[in-house]
């Protein structure tokens, strides 16, 4: 089966590419920068240039493709912004999929997006869901909370480096999930008819707020975190200020999203039906404690080896003094 992965260089996209290749699928990746995506080619995927903001590039990329897996979203630094990539680009992609008679379209949205229409990214995700449902295409929509992998840069690395961890004064509890597990559910949906034209939450086994994660990282790393709390009022001011400048529109959109995640909400959902339909045991998914334990064990072991090598070099150089 031939699959086109969009957003393949991202955190989730690259894991889906690797997992799909491991399972024997033919994988093609739509990328804007062939050089930055070279690692995907080394894994065995085929690369084709394309850009969601340029609809004419989509039809050639879909030739010979049976399934679209769309993990793409605009980045905070992307000048095109959420409207160009996440709205116009998605509509163009859905139209192209209809024209090429794609057999299945898998889309990743955000859990509870329909509850936050005031946030541009949330509103656009909800609109895209509706466009897909009304398209006549066979679809599966997964609604996500967050990835384990994103917690490394946000918490683990600064704690190890004795740098500041920035959090807000209030914190949402989020049921993060490992992208390896998300990829497993994604690929399983390709062979289960029960997943056709359905929307599923994909969340971890428990919710974590910032304080919980920091405490876990401190325990596993043996380090004390340097924490700075940012008042939500500051985020609101920053967002309102950014809106005055065209170059700040995308920043303002992201700050609006951050503001939602900073309030005392719960981003979680029952997975009982999902596990049953996908025939996957909940105990087979990775928990955050295990994920971070493996990360810190690997990093601390490497740091110990480096320190040992440096100590040995110093002893050797002292012999010649």
Swiss-Prot record:
Keyword Hydrolase attributed: no
Cross-referenced Gene3D superfamilies: NAD(P)-binding Rossmann-like Domain (3.40.50.720)
E.C. number: 1.-.-.-
The organism of origin for this protein: Cyanophora paradoxa
Protein's job: Involved in assembly of photosystem II.
Record keyword Plastid present: yes
GO cellular component: cyanelle; photosystem II
Main location: plastid
Protein name from the UniProt record: Photosystem II assembly factor Ycf39
Pfam families: NmrA
GO molecular function: oxidoreductase activity
Family: Belongs to the NmrA-type oxidoreductase family. Ycf39 subfamily.
Gene: ycf39
Location(s), subcellular: Plastid, Cyanelle
Signal peptide range in chain numbering: none
Annotated keywords: Cyanelle, Oxidoreductase, Photosynthesis, Photosystem II, Plastid
A GO BP annotation: photosynthesis
């Amino acid at each position: 089966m031939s699959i086109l992965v969009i957003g393949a260089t991202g955190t989730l996209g690259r894991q889906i590419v690797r997992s799909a290749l491991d399972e024997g699928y033919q994988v093609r990746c739509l990328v804007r920068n062939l050089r930055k995506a070279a690692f995907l080619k080394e894994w065995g995927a085929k690369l084709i240039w394309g850009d969601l903001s340029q609809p004419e590039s989509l039809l050639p990329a879909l030739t010979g493709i049976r399934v679209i897996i769309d993990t793409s979203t605009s980045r905070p630094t992307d000048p095109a912004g959420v409207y160009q990539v996440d709205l116009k680009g998605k509509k163009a992609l859905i139209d192209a999929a209809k024209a090429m008679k794609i057999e299945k379209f898998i889309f990743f949205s955000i859990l509870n997006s329909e509850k936050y229409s005031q946030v541009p990214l949330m509103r656009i995700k909800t609109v895209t869901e509706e466009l897909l449902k009304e398209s006549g295409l066979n679809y599966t929509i997964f609604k996500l909370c967050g990835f384990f992998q994103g917690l490394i840069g946000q918490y683990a690395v600064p704690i190890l480096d004795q740098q500041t961890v920035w959090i807000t004064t209030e914190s949402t509890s989020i049921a993060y999930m490992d992208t390896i597990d998300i990829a497993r559910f994604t690929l399983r949906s390709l062979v289960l008819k029960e997943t056709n034209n359905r929307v599923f939450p994909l969340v971890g086994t428990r919710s974590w707020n910032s304080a919980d994660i920091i405490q876990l990282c401190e325990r596993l790393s043996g380090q004390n975190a340097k924490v700075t709390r940012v008042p939500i009022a500051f985020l609101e001011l920053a967002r309102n200020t950014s809106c005055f400048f065209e170059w700040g529109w995308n920043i303002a959109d992201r700050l609006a999203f951050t503001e939602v995640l900073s309030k005392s909400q719960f981003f979680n959902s029952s997975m009982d039906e999902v596990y049953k339909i996908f025939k996957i045991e909940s105990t087979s998914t990775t928990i955050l404690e295990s994920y971070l334990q493996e990360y810190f064990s690997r990093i601390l072991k490497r740091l110990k080896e480096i320190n040992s090598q440096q100590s040995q070099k110093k002893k050797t150089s002292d012999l010649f003094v």
